[in-house]
C-alpha cells in the first residue's frame, strides 16, 4: 500500500473508443485533488483495439497500469484482479463507458476523509426503459427479502473503498463472486452519494437480458439458502394439500358412493407436481453446480500480459522479443 495514492480500477471489455476519453476525464478531475493516483485498466479479453489503446496511454503516462486477461473472464474477475494488484490506500471502481461520472470522485474522497470505508454511488433510473425500471424494482424488492444482505436499487460497483475494506474483500475466496453482495457483506462505515443516470455515448451495452437475468440469479443463490428451504416448505404444503384431498375424497365416497374418476383432476395434479419437482431439482442443481465449481479451485482469471512489476506475471510480448534478441546475440 502507498499512502496518499488513490487507485482507480476500470474493467474494460471492447471499450477501445472510450479508453482515452475516460483517461482524459480522470486527469482533469485529479488536477483539483491533492492525492496522487494510478489508473488500473483490466482488459477482459477484448476483441477490439482496447488493449492497444491502453498500451498507447501507458507508453506516455506512468500512472496508467494494465492487466490483460487471456480471454473474457467477466467483470467480477476483472474487479478482483484490480483489488489484488493495486497499491492505493483507497480504491475506486468504475466502468470505462463514461456512464460513471468522474466528477463524483471529489465526493468519494471527501467521504473517505470523513472516515467512511465505503463511499457508494447510487443512481436514479433516468434514461432506462419502463420495462427495465419495473423489472429492476421488482427484483430488488424480491432479493432483499430472500438474501441476508441489503441490496439497493441503483447501486452497483461504482464506489470508493478504503484499504481496510479492500483487504476484507480479498479474504473472501469463493469462486462464484457477486460483488454487489460482497460489498454489503463486509460492512464497514458507508456513505451514499446520489447522481443522475448518464446515458452511454459510445458503443453498446455488454449486458443483454439473459446476462442480467443470470447475474440476478447469482445474487439470489450466492447469499442465501432460502430457495432450498422454499423447496422444503413447498413439499410440506403440497403434502398437506394431498392429505386434505384424500380425506375429502374418502368422505365423498362414503357419502355418495364411488363416482367416475376425475381425469382432469389427475392430469392437473400430475402436471403441477411435475412442475414443482423440476423447479426444485433446478434449484438444488444450481447449488450443487456451484459446489462442484468451488471444488475445482480454478483461478478466477489468467493474465496474458501486464505492465506491472510482479515476478509471477507472464512476460509481455515486448519482453519476449527482447529476450529472444539477447539470446541471438
UniProtKB/Swiss-Prot annotation:
Keywords: Cell membrane, Glycosyltransferase, Membrane, Transferase, Transmembrane, Transmembrane helix. It is found in: Cell membrane. Its main location: membrane. Its EC number is 2.4.-.-. The chain crosses the membrane at residues 231-251, 264-284. The keyword NADP does not apply. CDD domains: DPM1_like_bac (cd04187). Gene3D superfamilies: Spore Coat Polysaccharide Biosynthesis Protein SpsA, Chain A. InterPro entries: Glyco_trans_2-like, Glycosyltransferase_2, Nucleotide-diphossugar_trans. One of its GO terms (molecular function) is glycosyltransferase activity. GO terms for cellular component: plasma membrane. It is a multi-pass membrane protein. Belongs to the glycosyltransferase 2 family. GtrB subfamily. PANTHER family: GLYCOSYLTRANSFERASE CSBB-RELATED, UNDECAPRENYL-PHOSPHATE 4-DEOXY-4-FORMAMIDO-L-ARABINOSE TRANSFERASE-RELATED. This is Putative glycosyltransferase CsbB. It comes from Bacillus subtilis (strain 168). The gene is csbB.
Amino acid at each position: 500500500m502507498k499512502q496518499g495514492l488513490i487507485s482507480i480500477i476500470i474493467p474494460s471489455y471492447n471499450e477501445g473508443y472510450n479508453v482515452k476519453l475516460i483517461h482524459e476525464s480522470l486527469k482533469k478531475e485529479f488536477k483539483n485533488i491533492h492525492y496522487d493516483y494510478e489508473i488500473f485498466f483490466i482488459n477482459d479479453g477484448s476483441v477490439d483495439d482496447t488493449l492497444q489503446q491502453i498500451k498507447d496511454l501507458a507508453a506516455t503516462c506512468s500512472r496508467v497500469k494494465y492487466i490483460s486477461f487471456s480471454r473474457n473472464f467477466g467483470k467480477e474477475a476483472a474487479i478482483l484482479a484490480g483489488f489484488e494488484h493495486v497499491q492505493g490506500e483507497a480504491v475506486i471502481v468504475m466502468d470505462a463507458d463514461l456512464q460513471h461520472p468522474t466528477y463524483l470522485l471529489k465526493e468519494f474522497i471527501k467521504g473517505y476523509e470523513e472516515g467512511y470505508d465505503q463511499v457508494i454511488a447510487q443512481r436514479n433510473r433516468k434514461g432506462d426503459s419502463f420495462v427495465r425500471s419495473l423489472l429492476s424494482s421488482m427484483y430488488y424488492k424480491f432479493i432483499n427479502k430472500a438474501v441476508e444482505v441489503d441490496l439497493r436499487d441503483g447501486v452497483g460497483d461504482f464506489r470508493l473503498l478504503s484499504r481496510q475494506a479492500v483487504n476484507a474483500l480479498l479474504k473472501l475466496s469463493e469462486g462464484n463472486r457477486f460483488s454487489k453482495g460482497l460489498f454489503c457483506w463486509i460492512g464497514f462505515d458507508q456513505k451514499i452519494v446520489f447522481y443522475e443516470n448518464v446515458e452511454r455515448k459510445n458503443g453498446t451495452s455488454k449486458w443483454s437480458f439473459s446476462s442480467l437475468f443470470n447475474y440476478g440469479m447469482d445474487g439470489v443463490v450466492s447469499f442465501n439458502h432460502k430457495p432450498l428451504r422454499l423447496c422444503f416448505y413447498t413439499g410440506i404444503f403440497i403434502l398437506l394439500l394431498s392429505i386434505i384431498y384424500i380425506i375429502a375424497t374418502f368422505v365423498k365416497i362414503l357419502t355418495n358412493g364411488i363416482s367416475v374418476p376425475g381425469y382432469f383432476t389427475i392430469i392437473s395434479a400430475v402436471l403441477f407436481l411435475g412442475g414443482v419437482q423440476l423447479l426444485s431439482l433446478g434449484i438444488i442443481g444450481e447449488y450443487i453446480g456451484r459446489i462442484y465449481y468451488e471444488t475445482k479451485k480454478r483461478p478466477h482469471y489468467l493474465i496474458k500480459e501486464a505492465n506491472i512489476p510482479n515476478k509471477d506475471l507472464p512476460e509481455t510480448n515486448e519482453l519476449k522479443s527482447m529476450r529472444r534478441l539477447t539470446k541471438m546475440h
